[in-house]
Amino acid sequence: MRNFLITGISRGLGCEIAREILLNGDAVYGISRTLSDEAKELARDFPERLKLRLYDLSDTDGILKCVFKEFIGLKTPIHGYVNNAAIAYDDIATNMQMPRLENMYKVNVFAPMIMTKYAIRNFILHHVKGSIVHISSISVHTGYKGLSMYASTKGAMEAFSKNIAREWGGKGIRSNAVVAGFMETSMSASLTPEQKSKIFNRTSLKSPTSLKSVAGTVAFLLSESAESITGQNIFVDSGTI
């Protein structure tokens, strides 16, 4: 049985990724700022293999102590880390407010960089050829009004992921990004039907991206079947063009 660390596990994509991993017989250490009914139900279904910890990733100073020392434990090997947690700041650049921008960068960029640092240290300590998967966004590659600031955080993580793959490939450690299209999640709930229709009409499939498709891709990248895949951006976006 392998152990995987997932952030943003409470609902939506994070919960679906956790479910995929648990159904494969592995264990999940899940981090979330809140605990949803969806996550509670998952914990009831997998009481021995799903461990949950409430933690606000904007508190970057506490990650080592609260996540890696107290929650996982330094003696516990982890075999993969999924950076799924993110917050959105939807607005045009001329309306930028620094406190909101800084908080988004803390959660979307600085926290996963620090989490990656300690995940790699855990891999090396336990002689694990670990896999890191960052959830990115199609907004990095195809412009959307109001997403310039959010997209910049995901673009930063794509660059980080590719360079981590280069730095640590010699240890058998892999790093990839899954570029997800627009999904029906709480993050997109504020969009009007008209806005959603415009977005989905830009895709080849004329439909939202399936949570299951993204989660299944993440599970594959974490598996040994993907042992030769690293430094890549894998698009799961309903064919956005």
Predicted regions and their residues:
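Conserved glycine-rich cofactor-binding loop
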Residues: 10-11
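Catalytic Tyr-X3-Lys loop
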Residues: 87, 94-114, 133, 157
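Conserved mid-core segment of classical short-chain dehydrogenase/reductases
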Residues: 87-102, 121, 146-149, 187-192
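Active-site loop immediately N-terminal to the catalytic Tyr-X3-Lys motif
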Residues: 94, 142-148, 206, 224
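Active-site helix of classical SDR
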Residues: 116, 153, 161
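Alpha-helical segment proximal to the catalytic Tyr-Lys
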Residues: 121, 125, 162, 166-170, ...
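Residue(s) in the substrate-gating loop at a strand-loop-helix junction
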Residues: 137
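C-terminal substrate-recognition "lid" of short-chain dehydrogenase/reductases
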Residues: 207-236
